[in-house]
Structures are given as C-alpha cells and as structure tokens.
Amino acid sequence: MKRAFIMVLDSFGIGATEDAERFGDVGADTLGHIAEACAKGEADNGRKGPLNLPNLTRLGLAKAHEGSTGFIPAGMDGNAEVIGAYAWAHEMSSGKDTPSGHWEIAGVPVLFEWGYFSDHENSFPQELLDKLVERANLPGYLGNCHSSGTVILDQLGEEHMKTGKPIFYTSADSVFQIACHEETFGLDKLYELCEIAREELTNGGYNIGRVIARPFIGDKAGNFQRTGNRHDLAVEPPAPTVLQKLVDEKHGQVVSVGKIADIYANCGITKKVKATGLDALFDATIKEMKEAGDNTIVFTNFVDFDSSWGHRRDVAGYAAGLELFDRRLPELMSLLRDDDILILTADHGCDPTWTGTDHTREHIPVLVYGPKVKPGSLGHRETFADIGQTLAKYFGTSDMEYGKAMF
C-alpha cells in the first residue's frame, strides 16, 4: 500500500539561498534566527529558553540547517541520532511566494514572472478599481496600497464598517487582498467580490497569482481579528502536478487539509478538509491519515507559521508554534505503516527577525521519514521539484518534467 503524507510548515526557511541577493534577503535564516533569539532569552514571551525541537532534530532538521548554512542552530543538538532522511532544497521558481513554492514541491516550478503591484501607494490601476466598483456595486474602496494585513485593519477597519467600502491592499507577493468585516459587510458578499476581482485580474492580463479574501471581526481598532474564513483564489498550475497525475493515472486520492486546495486551484484534489490553527490542522490530519487508503496523499499546510508569526515578525510566537508542532509530531509518526512516507517541508522563508513584513528567499528543509526510508543526508537539492519527482517514482506515475528523485 502506497501512502504519502506531506506537511508544509508554511514559511519555515533554513537559511538564505545562493540567489538571495536578487531578493534583498542575503543573511535571512528563519530557523537560525529564531533559535538564536531563543538561546539569548529574547523569545521568552509565552514560552521560555532555547528552542526545543527534539523530534524534528531526530528527523534531521538541525543537520539540514547545517547543510544550508554551515552551522547547527543555537541550542539545538547537532549530535542527536538522526532517524530520517534530510535535505535542504533551493527554489527554482522565479518568486518566493506560496503558489510558486507549493507548485514546485508538486513538480511544477514557476519559470515565468508573476505580475506585481509594486507601487506602495495607489498600488492598483484605476481601470481595475473602476471595474470592481461598477461590477460589485461598491460605494468605493479603501487602502489601495501595500500593507501588513493586521496593520491595515487598525488603520481602516472602523472606516470600512461605517462606509461599507472594502479594503484593497497588496504586498511584495503577486496578490490582490480584500479585507472586509464578516458581519457588517458579509462573508458571502466578500467571496463574491473576490470572484469578480479574480475574473478582472485574469481577463485584464495582470498575471496576479492570488486573490485573497481576508475576513475579520471586532468592533474597533485594536481588537479587530482576522478569522479562519480566509479564501485564496489562485490561478491553475501551468502543467499537471504530481497530485493531478496520481488522480488521473492511478485513480488515487489527494486530501487537502487547510489551504492546500486553494493554492492548487482545486486541481488534483479529491477531498477538502477545512481546519484553522495548528492543533485543529493536526487533528484533521491525523483523522485523514487513519482513513487513508492505497494511492493516497494527505497534504496539509500549517499556515500559522507564515500568517500569524512570520509576516507579523513574532519570534516568540513562531518559536512556540514550532515547539507545539514538535510535541505533536510523534502522533503522526506513530501512524505510519510499512510503505508509508512522511515528508516535512516548507514553501519559502519568512524570517521573523528580518526587515519589513514579507517572505524571505531561503532553502527549505526536506525531512523524510518512514519504516523503509534509509536515514541520512540526501544533500543539497537544486529544486523543490525533487519532492514531486520522488512522489512520482514512489506512486509509479509518469515522470515529472523537473526534479530528480531523492531515493
């Protein structure tokens, strides 16, 4: 029986890539800088002491970081017995965004350039804004700028509630984000607006990767909170992913837990399970692993590392999240049968000690565990697509165009 379980710790980079200079990210190191802050006692808010990740370390995390950067992260045990196979992987795709990273993991790197809204103020073309106002019958709009999602709620949330004008904003990623209050604006109305925005961006040739619905609740600045009803409208991958091939060629099953289905625009997904927060995502993943049959992938994205702690530059929160993940990891490992493989990885970096609020161009960890997986180093991988090619070989689908099987 062939089953693979892929866990993406969204934004969990392990050191800057060789091309980081192109992105202004030389020296970025999500894991290394979190570990350093913890070792110095600078991340004791809600947790305490050196970064404690014994289970990830046994799967090769510290060694993968050493391969990427040349050193073991502060406070982590470089001499621990390694029971998994580990690697550090470079991104072949042109960007450092979520779709690019995920698609490349599934064997389809993004070799074209996404469109971006690069102006920090008045970010969106007037023609696009006018069409959105007209088609969605809006009283206007707010924002039209680059911003952190939580900052812009404090700045414009109250005005949005009074006027009914949606908040439009973007970032260094190829995204068009729309924040609206779940109660005063309405969730269905927000989703409809996002569908219109997706259509206009696609038809207008803007080449924008995602439209993201960012619903929130609360009644005044300071207590607005984003909810778990986020929805991403992505374009489809430019070629069949290994997920699609498993479904088409092997009549397999691909279970999305969290936002995976959104990222792949539902392509190659046979079941969607919604969950919000690390514990809920873990619980849902465990349930699906227990029920998984032959030729099945269970694919989970743990988004909080990126959205709650990476972008918000919350070192202590990120560290606490990693430690929670590590504590629960044995629950996943204990469910593996003879031929199963568990892959822990990431899609990009988001160093919470870095300047700004955006992603960082970093190597990702590739930690592979299973009863028949030979422990040890799988070395430096030139593309995340090596994961997809490995899965193609494992399930016996046709080869992917990019990547080399790791074993």
UniProtKB/Swiss-Prot annotation:
Protein source organism: Escherichia coli (strain K12)
Keyword Manganese (UniProt): yes
Name of the protein described by the UniProt record: Phosphopentomutase
Cofactor(s) needed for function: Mn(2+); Co(2+)
Main location per the UniProt record: cytoplasm
The reaction(s) this protein catalyses: 2-deoxy-alpha-D-ribose 1-phosphate = 2-deoxy-D-ribose 5-phosphate; alpha-D-ribose 1-phosphate = D-ribose 5-phosphate
The gene coding this protein: deoB
Keywords tagged on the record: Acetylation, Cytoplasm, Isomerase, Manganese, Metal-binding
Functional pH dependence: Optimum pH is 8.
One Gene Ontology MF term: phosphopentomutase activity
Gene3D superfamilies the UniProt entry points to: Alkaline Phosphatase, subunit A, Phosphopentomutase
Family that this chain belongs to: Belongs to the phosphopentomutase family.
Modified residues annotated as N6-acetyllysine in this record: 287
Top EC class of this enzyme: isomerase
Function: Isomerase that catalyzes the conversion of deoxy-ribose 1-phosphate (dRib-1-P) and ribose 1-phosphate (Rib-1-P) to deoxy-ribose 5-phosphate (dRib-5-P) and ribose 5-phosphate (Rib-5-P), respectively.
GO CC, one annotated term: cytosol
